[in-house]
């Protein structure tokens, strides 16, 4: 039997990164180097560049372009933008696919893909694909007051991702010590998802 040590407990009062919680659908772009071995299902491969293979996924499954196999057109978008998305490099790149026809819609006439990893992607990294955006950072610092300050700013000023949209969903708090995301909603935050009403 393999021994599993109890994990270290991260300190709560460490730096956090607070981003706007976009109301769309979870999505991912996965890029693998096929020359390194390992198994992958070619049926789900959307694009190839040299030894790199690209895949698209929702929160729970692989998706491919097509009416019955896609998730709000994300796989089709990935296929179309593959040459630029290969700039993400090898790895699993999570984000939110949002806009026209998805959840709140944000009053947009198109869809957007916003990457979650704000430390890696954004204006500070010239390799950030131009077809992607990054979830807006609302605040950074210690956990004491930052969460309430960011919630108040979002409530009063509306969405930073889509200026003028006054019904944003909430925030995501990334706790740097635990490497974990936590969400705080502007409405029904204390109510389980299945019981919340709009």
Label for each model-derived stretch:
Residues 1-198:
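Core nucleotide-handling region used for phosphoryl-transfer chemistry
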């Amino acid at each position: 039997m393999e021994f599993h040590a109890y994990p270290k407990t991260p300190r709560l009062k460490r730096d956090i990164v607070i981003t706007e919680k976009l109301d769309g659908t979870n999505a991912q772009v996965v890029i693998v180097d096929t020359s390194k071995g390992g198994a992958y299902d070619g049926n789900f491969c959307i694009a190839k560049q040299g030894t790199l293979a690209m895949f698209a996924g929702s929160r729970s499954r692989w998706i491919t372009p097509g009416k019955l196999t896609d998730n709000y057109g994300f796989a089709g978008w990935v296929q179309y933008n593959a040459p630029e998305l290969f700039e993400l490099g090898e790895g699993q790149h999570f984000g939110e696919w949002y806009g026209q026809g998805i959840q709140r819609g944000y009053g947009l006439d198109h869809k957007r893909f916003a990457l979650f990893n704000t430390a890696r992607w954004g204006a500070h990294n010239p390799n950030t694909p131009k077809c992607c955006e990054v979830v807006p950072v609302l605040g950074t610092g210690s956990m004491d007051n930052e969460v309430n300050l960011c919630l108040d700013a979002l409530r009063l000023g509306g969405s930073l991702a889509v200026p003028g949209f006054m019904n944003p969903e909430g925030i995501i708090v990334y706790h740097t010590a635990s490497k974990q995301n936590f969400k705080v909603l502007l409405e029904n935050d204390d109510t389980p998802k299945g019981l919340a009403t709009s």
